[in-house]
Amino acid sequence: MDPSELKNIPLFAEVPDDKLLKVATFASLESAVEGKVIIREGGSANAFYAIEEGKVKVERDGEHLADLGPGDFFGEQAVLEKSERGATVTATSPVRLIRIDHWEVPRMKRAMPEVVEELQRKIRERSGSSD
């Protein structure tokens, strides 16, 4: 994927260009139509996502937790902690997502630990409010 697309995601905005090139090798683009379930509560954690365009809703046990849009990310907690998904995330408009598969996380941690540390910091900030 084009590394410049990652610059629009706050998580990656401060990553130096040389490391951003590496992040881009770990990432892929994915699209989803309105109404598509992107991750399902209780499911296995196979990837985490950052929203490039569009909006999603986050629900747990059928209760609405949050609406997310461009620049936001989700699914990282279950991937980093190797746990089940804690929430269902559904597209509420057509969305364009940056996807990083779970098997890329160890490689990413070796190549750029500061990015993974930032993810972990964000998890602590959210204190489990969504996944």
Regions found by a protein language model. Give the residues of each.
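A short, polar/proline- and glycine-enriched secondary-structure boundary/capping micro-motif
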Residues: 68-69, 77-78, 108-112
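A short, compositionally biased micro-patch
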Residues: 51, 61, 82-83, 90-92
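A small-molecule sensor/coupling module
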Residues: 2, 19-22, 84-86, 102-131
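Regulatory nucleotide-sensing modules
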Residues: 3-61, 68-70
